[in-house]
């Protein structure tokens, strides 16, 4: 079998001549062959590759113009492919004399193209059309080996590769105008002086300065100015703390006196916790030419790179917000650190999403502020395995432009190149701004302890502004007095701002910064117009009817057939039908809906089927997109297999999108902790830290069905631990009408709060959890649900309080036992606490003193520890509140069905006081 396989493969001797021809083409131009062969040839051993190259070139060499032309093309291709490896990118390296690197030495130093001396002698002596190989070498060395390193030959799309190649080789010699050069120098001086001013006024306060990477400021200035060439409406920035204050002041025009106030904490207040100044976001509108453009820097935590998907999600929200907008109207720019971009996994997650249908935004500009160190670690072998910190960009075929930050004119060139590429191909592009960090990780840190040689060099290295000033001075573009004069001018402006900084912010400013303290403890207080039963029936029939020309899978056909019966009031609405009808009601009123997550189109538990697949031609039909001509937009996307980046994306989407309900569903609630950073740092605390609100809905399937520790618990206890100051809403609905009403409440709520729903699994088709059409039409969301059986309150001896599906286990067993003396109450909203409603219900049983909190989760998990002291305060005097549930456990659940059933039975029997 193996012999036959070998003979039928490309390795067979019968294919040798064909492979030789392909290989010869590959040697001349690696991009000229199919990608599959490109991979094969590049994976050949280095020795064989070099020997083959030598053999080929020596055998084929003839003193003819055609042969030399091909060889020169090979030489040019070497520069395009490997030139970035020899470019002078590091500002801290001594700039060597280019002429010392001869053609022969260059080619021999290249690992991929070593050519024998005899061949080089012949090549160097040959002249073709008055162009010597020396001239070819000099010309292309000048293009590809100066202070910009172009890394793009890995791109598989030949159109993109050729476009970049042509842009570089035709525009590299473009010279900036004198006015532009002076403008760049001014930006550098302003950037440098602001940091020095901060240092002089606040020497002992952290600011994470931009010093060493000042070229970032003229780069971003150029981005903003250059975008007038495009139909751009908004730029959204994401960056960490390094250089943030400088960007806020010089790019987003945040008043410097406000930043001074933040240094002095003059405007600290007690209406929220706030955050450090280098985490705060800012938004402004600038006029560029005749066009206004919005600049928006997102607030972010210290967790590096997690802001990235938030920025892209916010960008997608802007595109989706208006049918007249597209990805040419928005530009996301993410500023990375060199250690973080190669170290943080969320970067890979986001890049994987960059061209996915539900997440693409027409390309992101990635700027790596590569200061060649991560806190105290500077050895590349300790920081990463890849050669370059930007190597991760290759996974999505993005071009990478390395540039020396001490050459601001080169920085401007790659900025133009990156912008043009992005708008032309609608793909991500990377700029590796190779710079250094003049101080320690922060200004009070001494970096010489761990990097003595490096920081000795940095100490004596001139700033970018000084170097560029000297360059312009030599070219007589400016005079000697320019620097001092302009520095005095900037100093005067900074002094004015500093003298104003101790003034308090206006009342208007304070008002817009404050957190709304509205009482929404009962989320059902938001006024909502119910939909009449007849109108709801019409709407349900629309979304549950499938066109006859679509061949539906038998199982899906039955589900939709049952849903039509629900619409006709012949059957109760299950969970999937109620959820879809809630979305339909919003869409019908012009409110858009976006659902995303792993397997949301069908639903992990086969319950949603929002997208119907034609079994004949694999086309898709989405009923919720076909309600009426003018309706809200409905977006539903099966996400990439990710939690952190996808949830962060949806958070970013929700904070900027208006008139849209945004839902993210975890495949199982257990997996949401893969995005714990987003939950902790953004969703639950973003409002209190940054005054940033969101109305994101998180559907987290939760419930103990014996499926093991990773398919049982959404970790209710974690969300309760994070709840405070009315920051989020947490519900555990047990009836299908509840999901219908809470979705509508969330969409219409005037107060934006994240909604965490512990959604069911086994209840999705459970008969007792279904609701009538009347309950959908006339009902409302209930934070607490009273006893549903007709019991005599005077005979009640015990009250069981619970949340979630365990209610039905208790109810079923109680009915079997015909116990009339035990009441079961459901707390459907566990945060904010429904104190008024619960107190009112408990008052009806004021003579009862035996209370049980019953839960499926272990004692140290679930809601018990959170509810314990709270519930005791609501109970009558001399009452006892006992716990019934699983014992404390490090693991959420057992992995054995037998043990699960035994535990579940014990919980039910103990709660109902049944002897086994």
Swiss-Prot record:
Xref: Pfam families: 2-oxogl_dehyd_N (PF16078), E1_dh (PF00676), OxoGdeHyase_C (PF16870), Transket_pyr (PF02779)
Molecular functions per Gene Ontology: oxoglutarate dehydrogenase (succinyl-transferring) activity; thiamine pyrophosphate binding
Annotated InterPro entries: 2-oxogl_dehyd_N, 2oxoglutarate_DH_E1, DH_E1, KGD_C_sf, ODO-1/KGD_C, THDP-binding, Transketolase-like_Pyr-bd
UniProt entry keywords in alphabetical sequence: Glycolysis, Oxidoreductase, Thiamine pyrophosphate
Catalytic activity: N(6)-[(R)-lipoyl]-L-lysyl-[protein] + 2-oxoglutarate + H(+) = N(6)-[(R)-S(8)-succinyldihydrolipoyl]-L-lysyl-[protein] + CO2
Cysteines engaged in disulfide bonds, as pairs: none
EC identifiers of the protein: 1.2.4.2
Listed GO biological process terms: glycolytic process; tricarboxylic acid cycle
SMART domains to which the protein is assigned, alphabetical: Transket_pyr
Keyword Oxidoreductase recorded: yes
CDD domains: TPP_E1_OGDC_like
Entry-linked Gene3D superfamilies: 3.40.50.12470, 3.40.50.970, Multifunctional 2-oxoglutarate metabolism enzyme, C-terminal domain
Class in the EC hierarchy, top level: oxidoreductase
GO CC, one annotated term: oxoglutarate dehydrogenase complex
Keyword Oxidoreductase: yes
PANTHER family on file: 2-OXOADIPATE DEHYDROGENASE COMPLEX COMPONENT E1, 2-OXOGLUTARATE DEHYDROGENASE
Similarity comment: Belongs to the alpha-ketoglutarate dehydrogenase family.
Subunit structure: Homodimer. Part of the 2-oxoglutarate dehydrogenase (OGDH) complex composed of E1 (2-oxoglutarate dehydrogenase), E2 (dihydrolipoamide succinyltransferase) and E3 (dihydrolipoamide dehydrogenase); the complex contains multiple copies of the three enzymatic components (E1, E2 and E3).
Role summary: E1 component of the 2-oxoglutarate dehydrogenase (OGDH) complex which catalyzes the decarboxylation of 2-oxoglutarate, the first step in the conversion of 2-oxoglutarate to succinyl-CoA and CO(2).
Name of the protein this chain belongs to: Oxoglutarate dehydrogenase
Organism: Buchnera aphidicola subsp. Baizongia pistaciae (strain Bp)
Record lineage: Bacteria, Pseudomonadati, Pseudomonadota, Gammaproteobacteria, Enterobacterales
Gene: sucA
């Amino acid at each position: 079998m193996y012999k036959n396989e070998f003979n039928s493969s490309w390795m067979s001797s019968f294919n040798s001549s064909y492979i030789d021809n392909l290989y010869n083409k590959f040697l001349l131009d690696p991009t000229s062959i199919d990608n599959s062969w490109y991979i094969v040839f590049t994976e050949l051993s280095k020795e064989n590759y070099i020997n083959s190259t030598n053999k080929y070139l020596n055998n084929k060499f003839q003193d003819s113009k055609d042969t030399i032309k091909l060889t020169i093309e090979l030489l040019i291709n070497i520069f395009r492919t490997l030139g970035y490896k020899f470019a002078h990118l590091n500002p801290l390296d001594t700039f060597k004399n280019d002429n010392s690197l001869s053609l022969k030495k260059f080619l021999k130093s290249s690992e991929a193209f070593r050519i024998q001396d005899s061949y080089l002698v012949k090549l160097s002596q040959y002249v073709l059309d008055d162009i010597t190989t020396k001239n070819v070498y000099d010309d292309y060395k000048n293009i590809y080996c100066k202070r910009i390193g172009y890394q793009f030959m890995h791109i598989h799309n030949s159109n993109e590769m050729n476009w970049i190649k042509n842009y570089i080789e035709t525009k590299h010699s473009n010279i900036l105008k004198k006015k532009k050069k002076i403008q760049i120098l001014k930006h550098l001086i302003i950037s440098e002086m602001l940091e020095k001013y901060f240092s002089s006024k606040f020497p002992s306060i952290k600011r994470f300065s931009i010093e060493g990477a000042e070229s970032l400021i003229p780069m971003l200035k150029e981005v903003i100015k250059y975008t007038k060439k495009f139909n751009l409406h908004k730029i959204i920035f994401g960056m960490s703390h390094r250089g943030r204050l400088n960007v806020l002041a010089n790019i987003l025009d945040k008043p410097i006196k406000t930043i001074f106030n933040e240094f002095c904490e003059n405007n600290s207040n007690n209406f929220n916790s706030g955050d450090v100044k280098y985490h705060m976001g800012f938004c402004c509108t600038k006029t560029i030419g005749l066009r206004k453009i919005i600049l928006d820097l997102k607030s972010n935590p210290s967790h590096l790179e997690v802001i990235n998907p938030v920025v892209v999600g916010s960008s997608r929200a802007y595109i989706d917000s208006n049918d007249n907008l597209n990805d040419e109207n928005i530009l996301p720019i993410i500023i990375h650190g060199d250690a973080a971009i190669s170290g943080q996994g969320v970067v890979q997650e986001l890049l994987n999403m960059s061209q996915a249908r539900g997440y693409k935004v027409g390309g992101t500009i990635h700027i790596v502020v590569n200061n060649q160190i991560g806190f105290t670690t500077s050895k590349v072998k300790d920081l990463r395995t890849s050669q370059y910190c930007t190597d991760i960009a290759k996974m999505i075929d993005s071009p990478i432009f390395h540039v020396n930050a001490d050459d601001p004119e080169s920085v401007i060139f790659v900025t133009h190149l990156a912008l043009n590429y992005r708008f032309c191909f609608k793909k991500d592009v990377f700029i590796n701004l190779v710079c250094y960090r003049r101080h320690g990780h922060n200004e009070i840190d001494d970096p010489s302890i761990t990097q003595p040689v490096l920081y000795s060099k940095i100490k004596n290295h001139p700033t970018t502004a000084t170097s560029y000033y000297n360059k312009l001075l030599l070219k007589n573009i400016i005079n000697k007095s320019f620097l001092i004069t302009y520095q005095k001018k900037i100093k005067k402006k900074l002094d004015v701002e500093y003298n104003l900084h101790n003034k308090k912010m206006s009342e208007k400013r304070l008002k817009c910064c404050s957190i709304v303290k509205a009482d929404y403890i009962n989320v059902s207080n938001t006024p909502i117009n119910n939909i009449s039963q007849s109108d709801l029936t019409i709407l349900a029939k629309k979304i549950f009817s499938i066109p006859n020309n679509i061949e539906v899978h038998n199982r899906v056909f039955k589900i939709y057939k049952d849903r039509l019966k629900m619409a006709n009031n012949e059957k109760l609405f299950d969970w999937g039908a109620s959820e879809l009808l809630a979305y339909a009601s919003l869409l019908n009123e012009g409110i858009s809906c976006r659902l995303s997550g792993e397997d949301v189109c069908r639903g992990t538990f086969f319950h949603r089927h929002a997208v119907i697949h034609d079994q004949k031609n694999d086309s898709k039909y989405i009923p919720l997109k076909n309600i009426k001509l003018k309706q809200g937009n409905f977006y539903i996307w099966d996400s990439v297999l990710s939690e952190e980046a996808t949830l962060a994306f949806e958070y970013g989407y929700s904070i900027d999108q208006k008139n849209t309900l945004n839902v993210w569903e975890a495949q199982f609630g257990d997996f949401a902790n893969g995005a714990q950073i987003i939950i902790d740092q953004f969703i639950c605390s973003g409002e209190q830290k940054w005054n940033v609100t969101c109305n994101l809905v998180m559907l987290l399937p939760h419930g103990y069905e014996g499926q093991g520790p990773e398919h049982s618990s959404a970790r209710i206890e974690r969300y309760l631990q994070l709840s405070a100051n009315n920051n989020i809403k947490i519900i555990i609905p047990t009836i299908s009408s509840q999901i219908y009403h809470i979705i509508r409440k969330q969409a219409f709520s005037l107060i934006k709060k994240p909604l965490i729903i512990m959604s069911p699994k086994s209840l999705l088709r459970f008969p007792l959890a279904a609701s009538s059409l009347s309950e959908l039409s006339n009902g409302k969301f209930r934070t607490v649900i009273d006893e549903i059986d007709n019991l005599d309150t005077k005979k009640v001896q015990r009250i069981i309080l619970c949340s979630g599906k365990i209610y039905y286990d208790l109810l079923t067993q109680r009915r079997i036992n015909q116990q009339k003396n035990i009441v079961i109450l459901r707390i459907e909203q566990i945060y904010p606490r429904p104190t008024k409603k619960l107190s009112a219900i408990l008052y009806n049983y004021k003579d009862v003193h035996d209370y049980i909190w019953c839960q499926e989760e272990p004692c140290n998990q679930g809601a018990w520890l959170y509810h314990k002291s709270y519930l005791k305060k609501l109970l009558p005097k001399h009452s006892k509140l006992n716990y019934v549930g699983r014992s404390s456990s490090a693991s959420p659940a057992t992995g054995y069905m037998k043990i699960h059933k035994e535990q579940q039975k014990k919980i039910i029997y103990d709660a109902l006081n049944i002897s086994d």
